[in-house]
Regions:
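Structural motif
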Residues: 69-70, 84
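Low-complexity, intrinsically disordered Gly/Pro/Thr-rich segments
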Residues: 111-122
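Short beta-strand-centered aromatic/proline hotspots
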Residues: 84-86, 96-101
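Short, positionally conserved secondary-structure boundary motifs
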Residues: 1-62, 93-94, 101, 105, ...
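Short, hydrophobic/aromatic-rich segments at coil-to-beta transitions
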Residues: 50-51, 81-86
Length: 139
């Protein structure tokens, strides 16, 4: 739970970025050319004051490549559109789902066949906390 807003000023941390693209198919000779540096803060955090991180618990979004234990980079400044993966509170309970808006109706849709979509109806309270911008996945 986020109790209050805080100012986030990422500290630059440039890391080496090699110019070669790595084939995911057949192997090719290694290329030792350093293209420059990359700062993960710059790559992952577009709006520092509106960004927060959450760790995933559960398997309802595995079809979207989001697994138990993954780290989410969530951006509150992004517009939640139909098709966005969002962190939302439904009647005060947090959830991670794909937002679907069609015909004036709203659903939170899991990406796993064992879970049913949740249609937001009547008195149900829905608050979108933010849109998932990136997923950090470890093996």
């Amino acid at each position: 739970m986020i109790a209050h807003a805080c100012t986030f000023a990422p500290i630059p941390c440039p890391l080496p970025l090699f110019g070669a693209r790595i084939p995911a198919g057949f192997p090719s000779p290694a290329d030792d050319d350093l293209e420059g540096t990359i700062d993960l803060n710059e790559q992952l955090i577009r709006h520092p004051a509106a960004t927060f991180f959450l760790r995933v618990q559960g398997d309802s979004m595995t079809g979207a490549g989001i697994r138990d234990g993954d780290l989410l980079v969530v951006d509150r400044s992004r517009e939640a559109k139909s098709g966005s993966i969002v962190v939302a509170a439904v009647d005060g309970e947090l959830t991670l789902k794909r937002l679907k808006i069609a015909g004036g109706r709203v659903w939170l849709v899991p990406e796993h066949p064992d879970y049913a979509p949740l249609e937001i109806q009547g008195e149900m309270g829905l608050v979108v906390w933010g849109v998932v911008a990136h997923v950090v996945h470890s093996f």
